[in-house]
Amino acid sequence: MIYFISKKLEISAAHSLTLSYESKCSSLHGHNWQIELFFVGRELNQDGTVIDFTHVKKAVHGKMDHANLNEVFDFNPTAENIGRWLVDLFPECYKATVQESFGNTAVVVDEEKIRGIEHLVP
């Protein structure tokens, strides 16, 4: 069997972007980020889960919620870079959607984690 699960989170956090062009996003500003993480498992762990939802929330909220993301990360905190960080954070996570505001969403997929089962991915 293959198990697919997802976890939705809301994070309140601020950031400023370092960009090669003039933008108001270069100033410190905040968002209520909507994040959805997608996990895959070919087996369940000893507790009968792919990953514990509360562990996911604790790891992400503990690092990002009510934080200045420029002080948290050593990379430019774009939605795309945050998505990549989230996918890399959990071995079971193959996809992250990171919405910083309505209409502005990045989707990051780790193709290696779903190689061979792409046709099954919801």
Feature locations, PLM:
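Charge-rich, low-complexity N-terminal segments
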Residues: 1-122
